[in-house]
Amino acid sequence: MADYTEEDKQKVLAQLSKKTWKIPELAKILKMDKKVVKKIVQDLINEGVAGYWSSGSTTYVATKEYIEELEKKRAEG
């Protein structure tokens, strides 16, 4: 059972589609509890909508589409 609203989920999803985020940063700009944001992100990952992306030293989260764009740019150099 989720302890967040569909509106909360949509806010997180909207931000994840714009750029990569570390969960604490995402929680801060959304003014939401970090645990709630982490739960929403995990649910989005489980649904196949979001995913993790690593810069090599740091792990971020974003939508699958945004991650695909980043990987394409990375491959192109």
Curated annotation (Swiss-Prot):
One Pfam assignment: DsrD
Entries under InterPro entries matching the protein: DsrD, WH-like_DNA-bd_sf, WH_DNA-bd_sf
Gene3D superfamilies: Winged helix-like DNA-binding domain superfamily/Winged helix DNA-binding domain (1.10.10.10)
Family named by the database record: To D.vulgaris DsvD.
Physiological role: May play an essential role in dissimilatory sulfite reduction.
Protein name (record): Protein DsrD
Organism in which the protein naturally occurs: Archaeoglobus fulgidus (strain ATCC 49558 / DSM 4304 / JCM 9628 / NBRC 100126 / VC-16)
